[in-house]
């Protein structure tokens, strides 16, 4: 009888620990998605097709936010800034890229973003 009670107790403890671990991992994942700008959170623009999205992803981001509502969000947003040199920006401007200024409001705060797009057509598709 003692072994049966001991076995049930051990099984209950294991089940409880497993539940806590699952809940913890879900909370951590939600935190990463909302607060630390995982890749999924970057996709705030819609594309008609994969080709347009690939074109957009190959373009440099030249100037990230001017202001945000939270300092932690500002740091997290900067993690995804692609660092490019001034000469690279100039060479891109020489390729007749279209400069687009956006004001974007996201969960993390408010941002001014300047992006360079490969063509006016892509600009019309995105916005």
Curated annotation (Swiss-Prot):
It is a single-pass membrane protein. It is found in: Membrane. GO terms for cellular component: membrane. Keywords: Membrane, Transmembrane, Transmembrane helix. The chain crosses the membrane at residues 5-25. This is Uncharacterized protein MG389. It comes from Mycoplasma genitalium (strain ATCC 33530 / DSM 19775 / NCTC 10195 / G37).
């Amino acid at each position: 009888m003692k072994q049966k009670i001991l076995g049930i107790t051990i099984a209950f403890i294991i089940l409880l620990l497993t539940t806590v671990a699952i809940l913890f991992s879900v909370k951590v994942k939600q935190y990463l998605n909302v607060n630390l700008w995982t890749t999924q959170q970057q996709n705030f623009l819609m594309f008609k097709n994969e080709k347009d999205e690939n074109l957009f992803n190959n373009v440099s981001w030249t100037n990230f936010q001017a202001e945000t509502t939270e300092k932690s969000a500002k740091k997290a947003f900067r993690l995804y800034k692609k660092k490019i040199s001034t000469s690279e920006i100039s060479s891109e401007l020489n390729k007749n890229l279209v400069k687009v200024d956006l004001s974007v409001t996201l969960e993390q705060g408010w941002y001014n973003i300047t992006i360079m797009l490969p063509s006016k057509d892509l600009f019309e598709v995105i916005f």
